[in-house]
UniProtKB/Swiss-Prot annotation:
It comes from Archaeoglobus fulgidus (strain ATCC 49558 / DSM 4304 / JCM 9628 / NBRC 100126 / VC-16). Coiled coil: none annotated. Disulfide bonds: none annotated. SUPFAM superfamilies: PUA domain-like (SSF88697). PANTHER family: UPF0310 PROTEIN MJECL36. Belongs to the UPF0310 family. Transmembrane segments: none annotated. Pfam families: EVE (PF01878). This is UPF0310 protein AF_2356.
């Protein structure tokens, strides 16, 4: 089993929660191809301005993959600025494990996370990625903060 940090925004988090589907652009096909049924996915929402309020980067849920990767270009996700008409066609069905009552703010975790080797420029470990594999140790650490 592998553990993944899935990077999204507020709008697409609503879609994930409602439809139990994760999708990535074609350019991330090599990454999503490594995901197997039963893997655990942590949903990470990037810092963004929502209705005039800056919401910090945070982890909002954990899911288990319930399918292999499949292709579907139907427009269910909202294409973020700068991504044109992206439909996130490479998708995986999800099964919710836990949607956190209180999101876990990400920045306080940075000093403790093994996968973030450059603690000062930590966003470089996530920037431009749709998802990235993380060590089981980091997954467990994050879940400790969810209680």
């Amino acid at each position: 089993m592998a553990y993944w940090l899935c990077i999204t925004n507020e709008d697409n988090w609503r879609v994930i929660k409602e439809k139990n589907i994760w999708g990535v652009p074609e350019r991330h096909k090599n990454t999503i191809a490594k995901v197997k049924k039963g893997d655990k996915l942590l949903i990470y929402i990037k810092q963004e301005n929502v209705n005039g309020e800056v919401k910090p980067s945070r982890i909002v849920a954990v899911y288990e993959t319930a399918s292999e990767v499949y292709r579907d270009s139907s427009r269910i996700f909202k294409s973020p600025k700068g991504m044109g008409n992206e439909t996130f066609p490479l998708r995986i069905k999800l099964k919710p494990v836990k949607i956190f009552d209180r999101p876990i703010e990400f920045k306080p975790l940075i000093p403790k996370l093994k996968f973030i080797t450059n603690k000062r420029k930590w966003s470089g470990h996530l920037m431009g990625k749709a998802m990235r594999e993380i060590p089981e140790e980091d997954y467990r650490l994050i879940l400790e903060y969810a209680t």
